[in-house]
Amino acid sequence: MKQLSSAEVRQLFLDFFKEKGHTIEPSAPLVPNNDPTILWINSGVATMKKYFDGSVIPDNPRMANAQKSIRTNDIENVGKTARHHTFFEMLGNFSIGDYFKEGAIVFAWEFLTSPKWIGFDPDKLYVTVYPEDEEAKTIWREKIGLSEEHIVEIEDNFWDIGIGPSGPDSEIFYDRGPTFGDDTSDPELYPGGENERYLEIWNLVFSQFNHNPDGTYTPLPKQNIDTGMGLERMVSIIQDAPTNFETDLFMPIIREVEQIAGVKYGHNQENDVAFKVIADHIRTVAFAIGDGALPSNEGRGYILRRLLRRAVRYAKVLTINEPFMYKLVPVVGKIMNSFYPEVENQTDFIQKVIRTEEERFHETLNEGLAILETILKTAKETNEQVIKGADIFKLYDTFGFPVELTEEYAEDHGLKVDHAGFEAEMKEQRDRARSARADVKSMQVQGELLANLTAKSEFVGYNATEHVSEILYIIQDDALVDEVASGKTAQVIFKETPFYAESGGQVADKGTIESETGLAYVEDVQKAPNKQNLHRISVKEGVLKTGDTVKLAVDKVKRRETIKNHTATHLLHRALKDTLGEHVNQAGSLVSPDRLRFDFSHFGQITEEELTKMEEIVNEKIWEQINVVIEEMPIAEAKELGAMALFGEKYGDVVRVVQVGKYSIELCGGVHVRNTADIGLFKIVSETGIGAGTRRIEAVTGKEAYRFVTEQENTLKHTANLLKATTKEAPQKVEQLQADLREVKRENESLLSKLASAASADIFESPEEIGGVKVIAKQVNAKDMNQLRQFVDNWKDKKIGGILVLGAVQGEKVNLISAVSEDAIKAGYHAGKLLKEVATKCGGNGGGRPDMAQAGGKNPAELATALDYVSTCVKEQQA
């Protein structure tokens, strides 16, 4: 067997399929682009769904990739098994309506057994097949020459993820020999069984059926191939490693952790689990942050936070009690740099994010652990088997403990956790967290009509807004028709069109279609599978027919305003990077006639000064009257120019480059102004956070910017008039009013304090004596909880001692407060427990510390009853 590094195995795979006529697709970012069905790219095929369901026709039906992936449905097993990972690489080859079973099987066998490639001993390889897949069995037996003993029928060998393409599959296994299992009585010791001897290395999926919504299966219009080879497994065989973790993908990380911890790997099972957890999780977190995800309490951000905190928990096993994960980022970058330069290129930013997250967790970890230990100890002392949901929620909400982390600690003590109770406390957050356990979701059912419309349609709208063309196709109700009449809607493809199809954030053009016999409006334009512009139209007069010569006219006003916003978006993108840092990546955009919206990745808040700076930069570029140059060039040349690519997009060999002087260079298929002066004016309307690590700027240009400024100016004038000041004097006048208001509030608080003190003389006079304990339970006039606290302060100052409970009516609700002196606490009284009981008598609840608590109620009419109940509670406790 050849001795190969992981980088060499990856490259051999891609070189092999390139030689076989496949286009090598770049690895997509882990954060899905325009696919809301999954949190992460979790397989090689996840980026190919649009080809498999026929919504897009690829330029080359043969494709291959090495795709970084994240799966989080088995986090608890990572580190405890030989091959569970949260981050992994999937090598795959794909055929969309080209070669099928024989081609896929022959390619796989050649790559695995040819001395030119991997060079495995054929006798070491076994395959599994679906029992009813006679075609695959015949190919393995007759074309490849495998004996019956090396072909195993497995009922589960059928790939089906719900509605969409499905079909049988064939898995290839490598026999690692009797060292990894030789018990002939073991019912799982066979290829496809649960054992360490026969290791699955490649899965060949033969997509030949549509799984229809009604549950039936029908043959696909185009049969497809989808294969997946786990790089980590493959490398473990080639490098003769007992588990994936002893390969060159993980060992450099483990060695670095050894240096940090002063503990050796391979000498203690508990320590080794910790090493593996850390090595796996840092790969996931580093790549995910590099691809635009950031730690948070929801969605994919919750997964990152959970992984980081799980790694920190395991680091304690290795006596690492300080932030350290960030130190491993350069190691990950170095291991993967030959194919994935993104981690090494963003090391500083990724380290900053991880270190900040670690420091935050360490601030609360020890306190949280102390509370958890108390909870676990109490549970054991009281013979409880389950940790309460309320306790789990407190650890999560206050100390940032993921419920899974609490569960792992509980399991270590032989206890379970109350998941249902926790979910009742925090249903929304748990729902979002559970959504992270999604796998590849159903694709659309593969359709034929649009995929079979192959006539070319040319977009001529870069240089024209009007054009005479011919109708090629009219589609109504998913069928080709010859004509569409007044009052009806349809989809139309023209031989040439000036109408821009929605893409890259730019909205579709609208406009009119005129022929000798009819008039229609274009309401939307989208891309068809074969890249034609597909126009959704409504016919207003007469009839339109296939073959008609028509005049197409784009709405010039809307187009003009749209392109101003599009070029301004490019300028803003560059200004964001210049102001905030190169880590900023586009996360989405909308370019419409009336505004632009730009979503981007950024860790932290944006200051007013930064927003002002960005706005100034964009306007300076507008006023510099820079020509916008657009040209097509090879992608390699565009990269040499430093062109920015849209994060997550895939590009062909020739790309369209939009250059705004030397300031902004981007790959873009949209329509733009000829000179930045055409934009006129740029104003930022708002800046907000829309999710973990994602922020949004909305802005306007041209007439809309003028309108926005005018509205702001009118608002300022109106405010100045109310203040009886000029617009220049208005800010100073507002500051003075604020100062006056603060002084009035201060004086008011002072008066209220004096009133409370005066009222206290009556309230605190002659407290009730119950078993030697002074008890005061009275209703007072207090507008809010702050005033009630002032009464408590006065009670403490007078050193009356005992128990105090006060209530006040505030509108339709009740405020309650209680206090217990130190000697009463020693006697067993607890302010929080007492007030919790009292509050129930007026429709409320609450609680607090032994010395002080507060509560609310919903029934003011029962306040007197609640206060009378205080004496009863004290007497019951003394009984």
UniProtKB/Swiss-Prot annotation:
Name of the protein: Alanine--tRNA ligase
Organism from which the protein derives: Listeria welshimeri serovar 6b (strain ATCC 35897 / DSM 20650 / CCUG 15529 / CIP 8149 / NCTC 11857 / SLCC 5334 / V8)
Function noted in UniProt: Catalyzes the attachment of alanine to tRNA(Ala) in a two-step reaction: alanine is first activated by ATP to form Ala-AMP and then transferred to the acceptor end of tRNA(Ala). Also edits incorrectly charged Ser-tRNA(Ala) and Gly-tRNA(Ala) via its editing domain.
Gene coding for it: alaS
Source organism superkingdom: Bacteria
One GO location term (cellular component): cytosol
Binding site for Zn(2+): H566, H570, C668, H672
Catalytic reaction annotation: tRNA(Ala) + L-alanine + ATP = L-alanyl-tRNA(Ala) + AMP + diphosphate
Location in or out of the cell: Cytoplasm
Cofactor(s) the protein needs: Zn(2+)
Xref: SMART domains: tRNA_SAD (SM00863)
EC number: 6.1.1.7
GO biological process: alanyl-tRNA aminoacylation
Transmembrane residue ranges: none
